From Swiss-Prot:
Record's protein name: Exodeoxyribonuclease 7 small subunit
Subcellular location: Cytoplasm
Subunit text: Heterooligomer composed of large and small subunits.
Database matches in InterPro entries: Exonuc_VII_S (IPR003761), Exonuc_VII_ssu_sf (IPR037004)
GO molecular function terms listed in the Swiss-Prot or TrEMBL record: exodeoxyribonuclease VII activity
Function: Bidirectionally degrades single-stranded DNA into large acid-insoluble oligonucleotides, which are then degraded further into small acid-soluble oligonucleotides.
Gene, per the UniProt record: xseB
GO terms (BP aspect): DNA catabolic process
Gene Ontology CC entries for this record: cytosol; exodeoxyribonuclease VII complex
Organism of origin: Syntrophomonas wolfei subsp. wolfei (strain DSM 2245B / Goettingen)
Organism taxonomic ancestry: Bacteria, Bacillati, Bacillota, Clostridia, Eubacteriales
Length: 73
């Protein structure tokens, strides 16, 4: 799979879902689109996991100083 941005991969995944939900694809094409959708889904999940690991938030502690804490979803 080519190197995609998260946003482009998500858009392509949404398009794949729409194609599959339309019911207009032949069986072989449906399987191909489904496989591509799985790859896109895994890519998006990986990108989100990596982003989650990088996110930190800044909070003010009781002493009035700022500290970095891991972001929790």
């Amino acid at each position: 799979m080519e190197k995609l941005s998260f946003e482009l991969a998500l858009k392509k995944l949404e398009e794949s879902v729409e194609q599959l939900e339309s019911g207009e694809l032949e069986l072989e094409e449906s399987i191909k689109v489904f496989e591509q959708g799985i790859e896109l889904s895994l890519f998006c999940r990986k990108e989100l996991s990596q982003a989650e690991g990088k996110i930190q938030r800044l909070v003010k502690n009781l002493g009035g100083e700022f500290e970095l804490l891991d972001f929790e979803v």
